[in-house]
């Protein structure tokens, strides 16, 4: 009987223990329900869920009970999330009241967790306010049309809110991204409102400068402090907006009838006044000063053209511009050909209007033929065709178009570019490096060039006629310490990345050029330079106050930069040295007499030129003289006119008419197979700043005008072991032929042939008057030589 009584007692005690456990769990569930506030944001719910799970692990001893506790935590989390969503959709409460309740909840928590909890409350409050503002804006489109808010001000406030939160870097970037998205959305809405309100008319009167918008957009991208990929995406959006704004501005200008002004130019003084007024209306600060300088330069250029007889628009230049537009705007070869034919018709029609049907004369016809030949000359580049890359009041950097943009005949040198630097006295060119090898010639003034690599820094004083090579990737900077003379440097570049394409990377920026350091995110720069962010911002902002990459400097600083530089003839020490500059004037004269002189630096003699395989030469032809017909065996020479005027004539085996500017594939093969040995005379008048190309094997003669000497600088591509063969003068190659070879070749008695080729007593350079003294029935002194060019 006693044993049977113990069993009910055990069952009673077990039931009592289970009841106590269930009661305890119910209380815990109620506490959890109170702690998981449905009005917290998702991050708060997740944090509290983690706290709940930790309590389950610490307070529940059995594994099964701990799992049950964790499942209850998960159910509570899901329920609170559903309640929060229902309240946001159906019955949202006043944000201020929610914020106060959230703060009260934070005060009940662990003091160590209170700051983080309060920041979450603050963020939730701001987001709810923003949602309400968006809802109000949806119902106030009409009001917004009348009084739109400035998106930039909204963006500034959003950024300030992100900074006040004091979150980690990742949360900061996410917040910045949301600000960016809102900013873009507001901008699109504002543009739509402006279009609906017809603000295009106002924009025609006071248009915003697209370049200023682009600069602000870039500055905004830099302030974000995002990663490199996000920075690039932001920069791409800025470029797209710039292109769109420029198209809109061009459309506005066309509607204002500016095309008529371009076709019928008014008085230059009126154009100058209009240019100045436009600067006053559209520019501010330093950009306004730059705009005024451009107006002044334009007026001076027009004055020079009037003095040279170019007060009316040159049909030839219009034709070249039309041809370039065809090549850049039309994609298919067929459409390019049709476009070029339209250019041809317009050119002929304009010539007919200028000359008139009854005004033909032998002199005008001769001039017309000469202009026609020059217009179809793919080897000649007018100085006005150079494109400006960096321009300021202190100087300019110009570059020639890619050689294959004009014609496929120059494919052999398509990986070379020509760049010209012009700098005023007492100026400094900001440091930069480029992805191209370069050979530089000083064609005016004096300079100090410094380039820096990882191992060393080298500085050289350069004078007129000095040549120096700068390796790809070396950071270089130039000064013009002369107080009176302008500096001019001509460069031949060989890009190392993409054929025919090069880029300049400036270490220090300006208004028109960005420093490559600015593209890096703030955290990268702060860590790499060990400098606070605010100092870096001042560092970059200070640079952008400058107008361009060529700036004025004090004489004291310029002297300090040049005092340790070496000059031509001094050999720098070190195996990795560049080798220093070469003085063309100090080279042994290759050809010289009283009518001209020719100096040349070859890669066989100068290791500085060996890697690029380029020769550099300087020629001075006295006025009224000629460099006799000759050709180069291997080198294709790019010639720059340093000073003077003149002309050249060249024998060319290709059809250089406008219909034959494109030499591709089968057409080239057909031309080679059907070649009849006929040559065309390619000619052009030369003036300072012009560029022309002499392909290897092409006989050419160059003459100086009767008024001034002609000075030329040439870069010979594939210059190693090049030979220059003269076709006239005492040292011509015809005199070296055997007697029988002369008679068989020219079908004349040997005596008559020798009388022709040995008649000239001078070599290399000859006077034009002496060539035509006896007169042999030729219209031009070069005719007797160039007629033979077809044989060679």
Curated annotation (Swiss-Prot):
The answer to whether keyword Lyase applies is: no
Which residues are annotated as site, described as Cleavage? 311-312
**Chain sites annotated for binding Cu cation:** 379, 652, 654, 698
Locate the compositionally biased regions of type Basic and acidic residues: 182-200, 207-217, 302-314, 350-375
UniProt domain Cupin type-1: residue ranges: 384-537, 582-754
UniProt keywords (A-Z) are: Allergen, Coiled coil, Copper, Metal-binding, Seed storage protein, Signal, Storage protein
Q: Give the SMART domains listed for this entry.
A: Cupin_1
Q: Give GO terms: molecular function aspect only.
A: copper ion binding; nutrient reservoir activity
Q: Where is this region: Disordered?
A: 132-153, 182-217, 240-272, 302-325, 350-394
Stored InterPro entries: Cupin_1 (IPR006045), RmlC-like_jellyroll (IPR014710), RmlC_Cupin_sf (IPR011051), Seed_Storage-Functional (IPR050253), Vicilin_N (IPR006792)
Q: Which domain of life is it from?
A: Eukaryota
Compositional bias (Low complexity): 315-325
Its signal peptide is: 1-26
User: Could you list the residue ranges forming a coiled coil in this record?
Assistant: 727-754
GO BP terms: namely: protein homotrimerization; seed development; seed maturation
> Where is it made, tissue-wise?
Expressed in seed (at protein level). Expressed in seed.
Self-association and partners: Homotrimer.
Function, as annotated, reads:
Seed storage protein.
Family, per entry: Belongs to the 7S seed storage protein family.
Q: What is this protein called?
A: Vicilin Car i 2.0101
| Species, as recorded | Carya illinoinensis
| Taxonomic path | Eukaryota, Viridiplantae, Streptophyta, Embryophyta, Tracheophyta
């Amino acid at each position: 009987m006693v044993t049977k009584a113990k069993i009910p007692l055990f069952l009673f005690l077990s039931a009592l223990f289970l009841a106590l456990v269930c009661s305890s769990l119910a209380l815990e569930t109620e506490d959890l329900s109170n702690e998981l506030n449905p009005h917290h944001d998702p991050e708060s719910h997740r944090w509290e869920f983690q706290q709940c799970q930790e309590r389950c692990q610490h307070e529940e001893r059995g594994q099964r009970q701990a799992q049950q506790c964790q499942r209850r935590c998960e159910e509570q989390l899901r329920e609170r999330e559903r309640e929060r969503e229902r309240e946001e959709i159906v019955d949202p409460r006043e944000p201020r009241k929610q914020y106060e309740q959230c703060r009260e909840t934070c005060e009940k928590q662990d003091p160590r967790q209170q700051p983080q909890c309060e920041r979450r409350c603050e963020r939730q409050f701001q987001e709810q306010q923003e949602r309400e503002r968006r809802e109000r804006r949806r119902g106030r489109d009409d009001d917004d049309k009348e009084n739109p808010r400035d998106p930039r001000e909204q963006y500034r406030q959003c950024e300030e809110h992100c900074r006040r939160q004091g979150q980690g870097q990742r949360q900061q970037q996410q917040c910045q991204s949301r600000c960016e998205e809102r900013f873009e959305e507001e901008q699109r809405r504002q543009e739509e409102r402006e279009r609906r309100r017809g603000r295009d008319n106002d924009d025609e009167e006071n248009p915003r400068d697209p370049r200023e918008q682009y600069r602000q957009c870039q500055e905004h991208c830099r302030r974000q402090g995002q990663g490199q990929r996000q920075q690039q995406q932001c920069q791409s959006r800025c470029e797209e907006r710039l292109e769109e704004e420029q198209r809109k501005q061009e459309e506005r200008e066309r509607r204002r009838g500016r095309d008529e002004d371009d076709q019928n130019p008014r008085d230059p003084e009126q154009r100058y006044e209009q240019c100045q007024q436009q600067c006053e209306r559209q520019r501010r600060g330093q950009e306004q000063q730059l705009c005024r300088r451009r107006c002044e330069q334009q007026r001076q250029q027009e004055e020079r053209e009037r003095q040279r007889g170019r007060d009316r628009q040159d049909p030839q230049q219009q034709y070249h511009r039309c041809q370039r537009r065809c090549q850049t705007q039309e994609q298919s070869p067929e459409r390019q050909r049709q476009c070029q034919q339209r250019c041809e018709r317009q050119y002929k029609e304009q010539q007919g209007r200028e000359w008139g049907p009854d005004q033909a004369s032998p002199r005008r016809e001769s001039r017309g033929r000469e202009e026609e030949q020059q217009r179809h000359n793919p080897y000649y580049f007018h100085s006005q065709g150079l494109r400006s890359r960096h321009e300021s009041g202190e100087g300019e950097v110009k570059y020639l178009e890619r050689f294959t943009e004009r014609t496929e005949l120059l494919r052999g040198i398509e990986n070379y570019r020509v760049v010209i630097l012009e700098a005023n006295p007492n100026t400094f060119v900001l440091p930069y490096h480029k992805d191209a090898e370069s050979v530089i010639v000083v064609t005016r003034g004096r300079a100090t060039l410094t380039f820096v690599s990882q191992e060393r820094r080298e500085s050289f004083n350069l004078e007129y006629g000095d040549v120096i090579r700068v390796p790809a990737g070396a950071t270089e900077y130039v000064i013009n310490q002369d107080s009176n003379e302008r500096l001019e440097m001509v460069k031949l570049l060989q890009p190392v990345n993409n054929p025919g394409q090069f880029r300049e990377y400036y270490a220090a920026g300006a208004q028109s050029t960005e420093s490559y350091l600015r593209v890096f995110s703030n955290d990268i720069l702060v860590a790499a330079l060990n400098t606070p962010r605010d100092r870096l911002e001042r560092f970059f902002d200070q640079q952008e106050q400058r107008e361009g990459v060529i700036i004025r400097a004090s004489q004291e600083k310029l002297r300090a930069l040049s005092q340790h530089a070496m000059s031509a003839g001094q050999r720098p020490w070190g195996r990795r040295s560049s080798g220093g500059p070469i003085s063309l004037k100090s080279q042994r004269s290759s050809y010289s007499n009283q009518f001209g002189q020719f100096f040349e630096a070859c890669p066989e003699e100068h290791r500085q030129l060996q890697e690029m395989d380029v020769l550099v030469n300087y020629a001075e032809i006295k006025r009224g003289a000629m460099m006799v017909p000759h050709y180069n065996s291997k080198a294709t020479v790019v010639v720059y006119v340093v000073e003077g005027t003149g002309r050249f004539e060249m024998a060319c085996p290709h059809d250089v008419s406008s219909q034959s500017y494109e030499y591709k594939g089968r057409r080239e093969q057909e031309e080679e197979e059907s070649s009849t040995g006929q040559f065309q005379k390619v000619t052009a008048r030369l003036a300072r700043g012009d560029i022309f190309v002499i392909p290897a094997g092409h006989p050419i003669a160059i003459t100086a005008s009767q008024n001034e000497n002609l000075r030329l600088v040439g870069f010979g591509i594939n210059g190693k072991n090049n030979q220059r063969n003269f076709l006239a003068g005492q040292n011509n190659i015809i005199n070296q032929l055997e007697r029988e070879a002369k008679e068989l070749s020219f079908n004349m008695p040997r005596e008559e042939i020798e009388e022709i080729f040995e008649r000239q007593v001078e070599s290399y350079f000859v006077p034009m008057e002496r060539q035509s003294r006896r007169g042999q029935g030729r219209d031009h002194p070069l005719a007797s030589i160039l007629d033979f060019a077809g044989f060679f």
